[in-house]
């Protein structure tokens, strides 16, 4: 997706330790035109599948998931990083955040993730695949079916794709970062 790649090279910031900051257009301040283009691309990539629900984890995955759900005319559900007292029939799992270097217990109500669901998971980043593995666990607990996972940005050098594909998961990434060494952003063509 050329528009996204151009924006990453133009406005993305690299930090030591393999961190790519895209908060000026994806996960703090958002560019709605870019987000619509991201949604359109996920719709194209997963056209012809039997997806009937979009899923993500709060917070940075919500915008692309909403846009994708809107364009596909499908409901969107997100796993919460804190369990509210009002949640019933909660499914939960532990997820490690690479960026924040901490564990979260993520929860979702089984009222909104059921055996009837064919799920497309959408998120901002694929690094080591920790969040995605947590989602796979929640989907298994619910009895739903995972159709595939779509990521705005994949950091290929952190091997999350390999982890997921070894489990039979279809992975689609819109921009694949090959390297961030010396804080230079290298994107796969």
UniProtKB/Swiss-Prot annotation:
Protein name: Xanthine phosphoribosyltransferase
Taxon lineage: Bacteria, Pseudomonadati, Bacteroidota, Bacteroidia, Bacteroidales
GO MF assignments: xanthine phosphoribosyltransferase activity
Residue sites binding 5-phospho-alpha-D-ribose 1-diphosphate per the record: 127-131
Source organism per UniProt: Bacteroides fragilis (strain ATCC 25285 / DSM 2151 / CCUG 4856 / JCM 11019 / LMG 10263 / NCTC 9343 / Onslow / VPI 2553 / EN-2)
Any one GO cellular component localisation term in the record: cytoplasm
Catalytic activity: XMP + diphosphate = xanthine + 5-phospho-alpha-D-ribose 1-diphosphate
Record flagged with keyword Membrane: no
InterPro entries membership: PRibTrfase_dom (IPR000836), PRTase-like (IPR029057), Pur/Pyrimidine_PRTase (IPR050118), Xanthine_PRibTrfase (IPR010079)
Gene of this entry: xpt
Coiled coil: none
